[in-house]
């Protein structure tokens, strides 16, 4: 991962690596024009967040072919710039962004929840702009199909893996997630897209196949010693806390900073 550091970008390109940047539009937009004029923006750039980015900045990203991930939960959770994820702005400028969970140490890597939060926040943003702010930009209602596409096809494209994953297409590897629509929280299901985006949870996943190999079946992960995995996690966390002199309090109202010497 590199920030707006052209020398690191050049090294990444020399090595054939994609360049992932934590990009905050309101803070960094002023640098885009110079980067674009120098030919330093391209399809190997992946910008995460893109919050509060002005229209001129979006046009530069689109023209340069920069790929974009938006982070519904993270942007709101941390109050990044205006706190609003940038999916609507990206779509308005002809960019199809992927969805990113961004920070699995703060909350679970749950793409079902990411889609739901995106749906709700986009609705709130639309109503706020139309009724409170007189916004010049009309917010079009997102459909569940669009959010599922952002979580699958567009996410694969952002990762540069669109030729091998993201959809069930001849020539791509067989990646499947089978959801048990007979589970009571999903039953009866009247619409596939709505069920996945609005109601499904990870507990509803019955089977997972990656590249044709079944890695989860009957709701159980295969080939993983869960007990040993938990032990390794506990050992790692204990080491980090002890090294930092941090004493966790499971009922604390907030994560307090470490004491300074």
Q: Where are these predicted regions, by residue range?
A:
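Structural signal for hydrophobic packing residues in well-ordered secondary-structure cores
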Residues: 12-16, 39, 119-123, 159, ...
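His/Asp/Glu-enriched, well-ordered alpha-helical/loop segment
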Residues: 38-40, 87-183, 199
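Active-site microenvironment of metallo-dependent hydrolases
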Residues: 146-261
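Conserved active-site and cofactor/substrate-binding residues in soluble primary-metabolism enzymes
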Residues: 3, 7, 26, 30, ...
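Generic beta-strand/beta-sheet core signal
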Residues: 22, 48, 69-71, 100-102, ...
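Alpha-helix N-cap/helix-start motif
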Residues: 28, 79-80, 108-111, 167, ...
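Histidine/acidic residue-rich metal-binding segments in metalloenzymes
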Residues: 1-70, 79-97, 113, 163
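Catalytic metal-binding/acid-base residues of hydrolase active sites
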Residues: 24-25, 52, 74, 104, ...
């Amino acid at each position: 991962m590199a920030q707006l550091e052209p020398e690191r970008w050049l090294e990444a390109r020399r090595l054939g690596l994609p360049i992932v940047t934590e990009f905050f539009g309101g803070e960094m937009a002023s640098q885009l024009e110079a980067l674009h004029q120098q030919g330093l923006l391209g399809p190997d750039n992946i910008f995460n967040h893109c919050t509060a980015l002005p229209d001129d900045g979006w046009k530069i990203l689109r023209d340069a072919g920069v790929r974009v991930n938006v982070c519904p939960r993270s942007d709101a959770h941390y109050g990044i710039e205006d706190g609003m994820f940038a999916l609507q702005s990206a779509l308005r400028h002809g960019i199809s962004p992927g969805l990113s969970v961004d920070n699995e140490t703060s909350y679970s890597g749950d793409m079902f929840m990411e889609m739901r939060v995106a749906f709700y926040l986009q609705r709130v943003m639309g109503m706020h702009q139309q009724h409170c702010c007189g916004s010049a930009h009309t917010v079009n209602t997102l459909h569940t199909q669009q959010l599922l596409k952002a979580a699958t096809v567009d996410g694969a494209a952002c990762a540069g893996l669109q030729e091998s994953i993201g959809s069930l297409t001849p020539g791509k590897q067989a990646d499947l997630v089978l959801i048990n629509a007979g589970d009571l929280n999903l039953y009866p299901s009247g619409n596939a897209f709505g069920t996945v985006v609005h109601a499904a949870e990870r507990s509803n996943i019955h089977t997972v196949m990656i590249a044709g190999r079944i890695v989860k079946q009957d709701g159980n992960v295969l080939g993983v010693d869960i007990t040993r995995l938990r032990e390794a996690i506990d050992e790692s966390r204990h080491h980090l806390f002890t090294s930092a002199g941090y004493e966790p309090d499971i009922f604390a109202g907030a994560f307090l900073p470490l004491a300074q010497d």
